[in-house]
Amino acid sequence: EEVVFTRNSTESMNLIAHSYGLHNVKKGDKIVITVAEHHANLVTWQYVAEQTGATLEYMYLDEHGHLKDGEINKIDENTKIVAFAHVSNVLGMEFPVKELTEKAHSVGAVVVLDGAQSTPHKKIDVQELDCDFFVFSGHKMCASQGIGVLYGKRELLEAMPPFLLGGDMIEYVKEQTATFNELPYKFEAGTPNADGAVSLHAAIDYLESFGMDAIEAYEEELVAYILPKIVALPHVHVIGSQNPKEKHGVIAFTVDDVHPHDVATILDSKGICVRSGHHCAQPLGAFYNVSASTRLSMYLYTRKEDLDAFLEVLKTV
């Protein structure tokens, strides 16, 4: 009853913004996020702020990707929503969930946690995290595209109006009125992505066959193996922390005098797949004065031999 199927994290975030944000935030209120947010957890709150007259306030980071001292105090009695990434999709940094959540709840704010980058890589317990909402996408964790999840505390979901209207989300329809289905069906209008849900179930079983703690430990081992070698290259600059324990399988970097798209193209020509661009986090890039970067991502199928091949090409760029 607390798990709603959606298309992806973006749709989950929009559901929260429209069904909770627009109905519970007003002029004079604050929405607090970090500057590192994916656009799905940023543009949504821009929209809510614009529509309600609320203020959107940012918590800023130091050069290592940690929250600057005192930024948490921006969460005050006027704050209604605190939304942030569990793990940054650019920096790989895990934000201090416990500290931020306790601060938010102490002033009566709800916590929206973007788990798109964390869920594939570490064990997740929403009760332990004590967030009010949690979202993630299946395609980032070996499921097919087009399936996502929204977790919400039942009392919040029950009080929220539907996001999409139509078939399956109704209880009874008359000419002028309609009543809505129980949870979670109230938020699952139309034909569901049954194939996607089955693929997500299979993906979860697959990942749990290894153990999420084992996957997290293996990725940390991979990062510890390759990160110092990248940092040692004088023409390459890693964004954020250089502590392997703080990268969670993601290393974003720039190369002197070479555009990230060109870096990615050169690597691709050698059979190495990376991501280049702003990674749907333009305010973070602007904050660090980096318009784009190349991102190396590791997962349970990555081998040290793959990283060696990556490094040899990177040396020549």
Predicted regions and their residues:
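Pyridoxal 5′-phosphate
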Residues: E1-V317
